[in-house]
Amino acid sequence: VSLTEQSGSFVLKDGMKIGVSDQSLFPAVGYLQEILRNVISSSVEVTTDKNQVDMYFQLKDTGGKPGSYKLQSTPEYIRVEANDYSGIISAITTIRQLLPAAIEVQGEKQTYSIPVVQIEDAPRFEWRGFMLDASRHFWNKDEVKHVLDLMSLYKLNKFHWHLSDDQGWRIEIEKYPLLTEKGAWRKFNKHDRTCMARAKEEDNTDFLIPEDKIRIVEG
């Protein structure tokens, strides 16, 4: 793991082109496009041609552990090499972290730049997890997606979605109706009084999430 910073910067600009070594990296670059949406006005072109591009992402055996990557930024271009897909995602997240926090909110478009650096990075821990407990408190789809985005920002790679306790089962799956017909209910007991009082104060209602309304994917 190393970081070398030099003078100069790579300026993000309209009309940028991003190259990838193969089409399997298109979803990863889609993540980068979402990041750049608040930075530049025009759409970002993605191509499998490595010539005349501003950023290039390549899957390549770098000799490192899974999730490792090498990132080089110059005033002219940014190049990333990674062992695997997760390394590409981590490199994109590093690009996001090198930009000012102002890119995280929509506003007037400004000129942003990335410092000239050379980075070789690899995860210290293989399992970097976060658990979301949706069994006792409802989370809508946008809130779950926001949690996943923050996980990506902090390079967490394991999402534990805690959906079931004696308090209920939170996703309706038509193939398994008993999960909600029986699993979503239980008898009242004395431990519920405090929770019910809190729920009344906060005005939060638990309810089922239809299966077709959820799209949480790995990547």
PLM feature segments, named:
Residues 1-125:
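Contiguous, structured surface segment used for ligand recognition
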Residues 35, 147-150, 154, 182, ...:
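Generic, well-ordered alpha-helical scaffold segments in large soluble proteins
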Residues 21, 135-136, 205:
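A generic structural signal for short
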Residues 133-166, 173:
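A conserved hydrophobic secondary-structure block that centers on an alpha-helix together
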Residues 88, 144, 213-214:
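Aromatic/hydrophobic pocket-lining residues that form the small-molecule binding cavity
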Residues 123, 167-219:
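Aromatic- and acidic-residue-enriched carbohydrate-binding clefts of CAZyme catalytic domains
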Residues 26, 89, 138-141, 170:
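Loop/helix-junction capping segments adjacent to catalytic residues or to phosphate/diphosphate-binding pockets
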